[in-house]
Amino acid sequence: MQERYQPNSVEAAAQQTWQARDAYLVHEHAKNPDGSEKPKFYACSMLPYPSGKLHMGHVRNYTINDMMARQLRMRGYNVLMPMGWDAFGMPAENAAIKSKVPPAKWTYDNIAYMKKQMKAMGLAIDWSREMCACDPKYYKWNQWLFLKMLEKGIAYRKTQVVNWDPVDQTVLANEQVIDGRGWRSGAPVEKREIPGYYLRITDYAEELLDQVSTNLPGWPERVRLMQENWIGKSEGLRFAFPHRIAGADGKLIQDGKLYVFTTRADTIMGVTFCAVAPEHPLATHAAQSNPALAAFVEQCKLGGTTEAEMATREKEGMPTGLTVTHPLTGAEIDVWVGNYVLMTYGDGAVMGVPAHDERDFAFARKYGLPIRQVVALEGKTYSTDAWQEWYGDKQAGRTVNSGKYDGLAYQAAVDTIAADLAAQGLGEKQTTWRLRDWGISRQRYWGTPIPIIHCADCGPVPVPEQDLPVVLPDDLIPDGSGNPLAKNEAFLSCSCPRCGKPARRETDTMDTFVDSSWYFMRYTSPDNDQAMVDARNDYWMPMDQYIGGIEHAVLHLLYARFWTKVMRDLSLLNFDEPFTKLLCQGMVLNHIYSRKTPQGGIEYFWPEEVDNVYDAKGAIVGAKLQRDGSEVNYGGVGTMSKSKNNGVDPQSLIDTLGADTARLFVMFASPPEQTLEWSDSGVEGANRFLRRLWALGYAQREAVGRGLATGADWAQAPAPVKELRREVYGLLKQADYDYQRIQYNTVVSACMKMLNAIDDAPLPEGPAADAARAETLGLLLRVLYPVVPHITWHLWQDLGYAEHLGDLLDAPWPHVDEAALVADEIELMLQVNGKLRGSIRVAAKAPKEDIERIAAAQEEVARFLEGRPPKRVIVVPGKLVNVVG
């Protein structure tokens, strides 16, 4: 055994052995030595995008997964920990444009490097199950399921107003529009009408919502709430404002009814205007004879179509000159075009009740529209001068200024008004959803080709199943001017499957969220080229533990749940939800340093480029550049980011201090679900602990060897040996509990205390001490192994544990020796007249009379009683003894 800890050689030796053994190859229905079947456990991290290099967020995510997998394997589970690559998407195209290489080459080069990094981390991944989204063997099944959805009517084609990114030249989902700009390009998003394919996720809205509360108890509450809010169930009233507005053909537009939906039917008597979306038929009709309105409509189309953007955008409108009729009062109501109204939500029109809706209130004040109060609260005075929160209260209010509906509470008003509108054929109660069907068409090259052929005679025709996959050409180099598939004749040209005439392939590709909606099931059946999944999927799924960032709380998780339900309804699987438990690990943070450039931009500096300036309390208040002493701004801590120069390269850390140091730091520094603040001193502390562990093993190697060979009779062991065993087994019990709670930082803390206890124990020489050293160090190595597998495996081998107990890879999780936790002696607090004056040690099973005698005989008692005899002695078993005198 080498004297000094050398992480590079230690880790290389361990990894070579594991690879030679196929140590992490997993099979279904694995058996115990007695022939019984092991329970399965499927633990999976969200698959990464192959961007080029791992970042510390990856290291944290995968180490959490790896700790879980290794510890559960020790507990006797058949554990699956797979890995794959979310390989399609725009970054590969953008990189290809920049480097003038095909996205495929860029992607596979990155995968090779990142896979090498993962192996260097020592992750217990079954690489035989590796999948890659850009592999035709994988995306064939995207296409196959899409065709099945077409057959069932779940997938369909329609033209709709969409978010268009003019730089990336593609449609964006609502969630991909951030503050009116594309999530990748940063370009202002436009509205366009484009045909595309959609999936009816709204058909599953009720089930998706209901099962959030009934089927996902193992998910964080905040994620469940985010899912519920995104699905967004609203119960209200859909009703019409009649009108006599005719189009150019002389027919009434939309049959003479302007429909709106409201959850506040109790305020209908307060409607003073209606607003329609810029794309609404009434807006189009009015704009034909109104150039100013036409210009306003075009201006509105420059923004995105997301609810979030609508909420923050300044509300603007223009009157159409059209009016509709209030269905209950017969009053004429002006129709406006509003830039905040979405054509894709409801009927593309809203009623305006300024008195009781904050948005409408601001709009009415801006344009001088009437404000009519129709709900009042006792003791409150209404004023149109400024909005007050109670104006929107629907629980405590009563209707006023509403004619026959005066004096009604919210539900009574809703029911009465709904009944009256229904009697006129102008309204009905309805449930609506915030959730919208999933548009999966993307005008990009690097994605799953949509398996459709366009024929001049037959229209869109599905590609026959036997012709799948429609293979994406992998040698194209995008130039930034639209979709290169649309220019590639070899891909485009084909024959119609129905009539045989020349036809053209669909050039849109699928949203990359399709790829990540079921990849975790392909891990279970990776080598089946005849079926999407097989019986092995029934064995592993649903997944026991999913691990990933909170940023995926809505989109990815919702789409994966939807995809699972579709596959269930196609009889491909027999469960409702894909993920039993979800852990959202916290972000990794680091210090941010910056200053403004002369051009008005922001320049960021690496933490190692600056010296911090501290205040009297030791807090960072600024920084100076090391190279010239100039001042830079300290921006606190934030998520590690390439753009802010505050990331830490895991590979550099692995190369210098080892993967075990990186793993130990990210597990010890913070609970898994909380943010982790990077600390160079913390990293050094982790490395120092590992050096201490190695030094302890080296110093005790001979004693451990003797102890493993001889063993001991613990009942006859000296008191220091019993005390060491009691302390270590107590820490083992705590670590065992914390492993089950996934509180890995306190697991590491327990291991550090174990090391201190073993290192500091004043053991006498002899067989019992040798056996105690061997036992307690062996316990520490096993508890610590899931955290730092390389050093613990190496020490296990070098110290002889493998020879006596088998390879650490296959070692069982240690059981707590309850007998060791029973103390021969216990310590009791000693009080004199109720005040703490010291402590005494007594036999654990000492009778009350002996404890009273020992306590009364203490020097402290005589001193504080000033020679007086005790009047009485009170014993609180196991805690204290109080001498009263």
Curated annotation (Swiss-Prot):
Matches recorded under InterPro entries: aa-tRNA-synth_I_CS, aa-tRNA-synth_Ia, Leu-tRNA-ligase, Leu_tRNA-synth_edit, M/V/L/I-tRNA-synth_anticd-bd, Methionyl/Leucyl_tRNA_Synth, Rossmann-like_a/b/a_fold, tRNAsynth_Ia_anticodon-bd
Residues that, per the record, bind ATP: K642
EC class: ligase
Cellular compartments per GO CC: cytosol
UniProt motif ('KMSKS' region) ranges: 639-643
Pfam families cross-referenced by the UniProt entry: Anticodon_1, tRNA-synt_1, tRNA-synt_1_2, tRNA-synt_1g
Single GO BP term: leucyl-tRNA aminoacylation
One annotated GO molecular function: ATP binding
Motif stretch ('HIGH' region): 48-58
UniProt-listed SUPFAM superfamilies: Anticodon-binding domain of a subclass of class I aminoacyl-tRNA synthetases, Nucleotidylyl transferase, ValRS/IleRS/LeuRS editing domain
EC number(s) per entry: 6.1.1.4
Localization (cell): Cytoplasm
Catalytic activity of the protein: tRNA(Leu) + L-leucine + ATP = L-leucyl-tRNA(Leu) + AMP + diphosphate
Entry protein name: Leucine--tRNA ligase
Gene name per UniProt: leuS
